[in-house]
Amino acid sequence: MKISLTAATVAALVLAAPAFAGDAAKGEKEFNKCKTCHSIIAPDGTEIVKGAKTGPNLYGVVGRTAGTYPEFKYKDSIVALGASGFAWTEEDIATYVKDPGAFLKEKLDDKKAKTGMAFKLAKGGEDVAAYLASVVK
């Protein structure tokens, strides 16, 4: 069986590409829905996105242990998730924003797990996650 060099190169690139890829530029626009509750403020006080403080500051959320932003009072379930060693990835953020309650119930294996985030983002979670990752680079 003959495989062309082009086909082999394309296959290698597809296999090497990350399975998760959001668009940070689209995510920046989509984040307008999020700023109703969240802001993005750098440690030096620079307001990247001025938003409400109903939810935690999302600066540096990718890689952060869940439920640990010091200036926010989290619900018990998200604190328990963090206590288990869980740290946010872009993929997890994208899944979480689709259905925060279902995400916590699955991750904690607890049907009674509750979230403080009632909003569900049906589409664009990957883009928002990519945007959140990009603001700290």
UniProtKB/Swiss-Prot annotation:
One GO MF annotation is: electron transfer activity
Give a short account of its post-translational modification.
Binds 1 heme c group covalently per subunit.
PROSITE patterns of this UniProt entry? CYTC (PS51007)
Q: What GO terms describe the biological role, i.e. biological process, of this protein?
A: photosynthesis
**Chain segments annotated as coiled-coil in the UniProt record:** none
Signal peptide annotation: 1-21
The UniProt keyword set, sorted, is: Electron transport, Heme, Iron, Metal-binding, Photosynthesis, Signal, Transport
Q: Which cysteines are joined by disulfide bonds?
A: none
Which positions are annotated as binding heme c? C34, C37, H38, M117
Q: Which Gene3D superfamilies match?
A: Cytochrome c-like domain
InterPro entries found in the cross-reference section: Cyt_c-like_dom, Cyt_c-like_dom_sf, Cyt_c_1A/1B
Q: What family name appears in the similarity comment?
A: Belongs to the cytochrome c family.
Function, as annotated, reads:
Cytochrome c2 is found mainly in purple, non-sulfur, photosynthetic bacteria where it functions as the electron donor to the oxidized bacteriochlorophyll in the photophosphorylation pathway. However, it may also have a role in the respiratory chain and is found in some non-photosynthetic bacteria.
PANTHER family in the record, alphabetically? CYTOCHROME C
Q: In its UniProt entry, what is this protein called?
A: Cytochrome c2
Species, as recorded: Rhodobacter capsulatus (strain ATCC BAA-309 / NBRC 16581 / SB1003)
Lineage, opening ranks: Bacteria, Pseudomonadati, Pseudomonadota, Alphaproteobacteria, Rhodobacterales
